[in-house]
Amino acid sequence: YQSVSGAGKASMDELIDQTKLALDNKKINSKNFTKQIAFNAIPHIDDFSNDGYTKEEMKMINETKKILDKSVEVTATCVRVPVLVSHAESVNIEFEKDFTLEKVKNLLENAEGCKVVNDQKDGGYITQLEAAGKDETFISRIRKDNTNEKAINLWIVSDNLLRGAALNAVEIAEAYIKSKQ
């Protein structure tokens, strides 16, 4: 879930302008996006490849494999969202071996640059708006995947102008790998 700042200042300005026009119930023309970005989510960032993935999605997949291991299975759908700053990821990680949720949480709490905010209640997580201007990568909504006993789901958010979204996921995976050695 990539903010418009990932597309540059002109795109940030366009979101602000489109929001004003939408609130005034006026016609909106998109210049930097394929569709209206104000009050919308666009599941398309960069050019499409023949396989249906976009260049941005393939970049995320390939960077993860390059840093971790080429055998790591990764898929992604990149979505441009009407937020000025900060990217977010909904991540599912499948482990080879059994794990405890407490061990994963402890590992993440001790990972450099990460801050766990995982209160299982309304508002007990960090949003893109709250992450803007902060150096940490925030990890929330840590839970076991109820469809796969060897997997977890996470919500990861960081200020993309300070840290890259793909880097965050990779650093979390690296921390887990180091803990197994």
What would you call each of these model-derived segments?
Residues 72-181:
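C-terminal active-site/capping subdomain that shapes the small-molecule cofactor and substrate pocket
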